[in-house]
């Protein structure tokens, strides 16, 4: 019996890439998962990007506030500690803004087509997260002269099921000739 190990966010991204996120096939997107932690699954030109040492997607530990609060990883001002801190205080708008700033870094670095949001925390207030992240990306697009064409932000379809669907694809895709699982 084959065994495959991968990050939940990579599994979700794979599920979205091959499982029918409308317009995702062959495109580049970030799946941002906000739950008890914060991670990302990255799809570049239709394939999950894991990095040379499988470390791609450690989204929650990018530093965005140099003198910020201490994170459990040992850094200060990580997106995860700032975002989850706001969630813990009931400040959903602030959590969405912080998530948007970090998403803007991804958009600027990778020039992705769409940002998809998921996870239990996002499920609790999906409109607030889509709106908050979208506002930050819209401001970024205006500053960069993109003519107001911000990268779209949506809630990933199929909720928590997408992780399980992607995990199944990790095993099944190679059996059906899809080598980029």
Go through each PLM region and give its residues.
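ATP-binding/phosphotransfer module of carbohydrate and carboxylate kinases, centering on a glycine-rich
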Residues: 20-25, 67-181
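Phosphate-binding/catalytic loop of phosphoryl-transfer enzymes
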Residues: 1-74, 78-83, 175-181
